[in-house]
């Protein structure tokens, strides 16, 4: 489409403001030294975040990758601004960060919002509770000015956690939800919708490029698409239904053998999920097909066979999206190679797959709120 090309050209222009990407120490070594790596890997499927580049029509935020599990970037809240590292999550809709009132250990390890230091802070009497795969976050709903790079949302509703019953090893301060308002836990307008409604972004789209192998360069961009981050054309997939980043998937197969989703199924494109998740029986079938053996909570293969493993092909809207062995196998701190397929415990009675970062590192993704669709193309 012409406007995609034009926006890509705009992003290259001198009007973009670039904020340097800061490398974050990998979580793998830190957690391994404390014998907490297994718990972290088991509990956390989140990932990503933002800093900023700015063009007249396109805002780009670099993301920092920690251990190939979470991508972190910065937002600021309050006046004067207080900075937080957050996970940008298309699987949820709400923004929350720790409150200065939160005295438990999980909060004390992160930056906490000091509301008394913000002249634009506005409290409410509403409370919230959000349940994630890693635990529960509880707190109060408040309002203040939130900045994502040069994008500014005044009087933005968000959550201040007063209790976080999650792992104390999470490398992020909070979560920036980018899903539809319909799944908001506290039924307030999410930040992307508020920016869209106020005309702060030129097009109601955002997109992700996730770098591979711990490299720098991951970005989330708002208001347009920079074509330099993908090859070929974007393949558009309608949502089913509008209101959640979920699409129809035709099937999953290996070497012409259908191994899952044989009658069609649903797939959530989730930047907040680290791995690829599906029904237990079908995930077990995939593990068996590639010769993976269980050990503890994971499945392992000999590292010597990774480059010979077959690609797993996800067919979406009549387009094949192969994921090769080198993408779906990761190596732990002991040099052992494990698969990145997990049971989706959230929908045991329905065949729903979650396409997380393992998939999205290969495919540039565009989330188009204006047309209720997702665009996918091979990432550069």
UniProtKB/Swiss-Prot annotation:
InterPro entries, sorted: Aspartic_peptidase_A1, Aspartic_peptidase_AS, Aspartic_peptidase_N, PEPTIDASE_A1, Peptidase_aspartic_dom_sf
Ranges of residues in domain Peptidase A1: 71-377
Protein name: Pregnancy-associated glycoprotein 6
Pfam families registered for this protein in UniProt: A1_Propeptide (PF07966), Asp (PF00026)
Domain of life, source organism: Eukaryota
One annotated Gene Ontology cellular component of this protein: extracellular region
Keywords attached to this entry: Aspartyl protease, Disulfide bond, Glycoprotein, Hydrolase, Protease, Secreted, Signal
Entry's localization field: Secreted, Extracellular space
Organism listed in the record: Ovis aries
Major site of localization recorded for this protein: secreted
Active-site residues from the entry: 89, 270
GO biological process, one term: proteolysis
Positions of the propeptide segment: 16-53
Residues listed as glycosylation sites in the UniProt record: 57, 74, 125
Expressed in which tissues: Trophoblast and placental tissue. Produced specifically in the invasive binucleate cells of the placenta.
Enzyme Commission identifier(s): 3.4.23.-
Disulphide-bonded residues: 102-107, 261-265, 303-337
Signal peptide feature range: 1-15
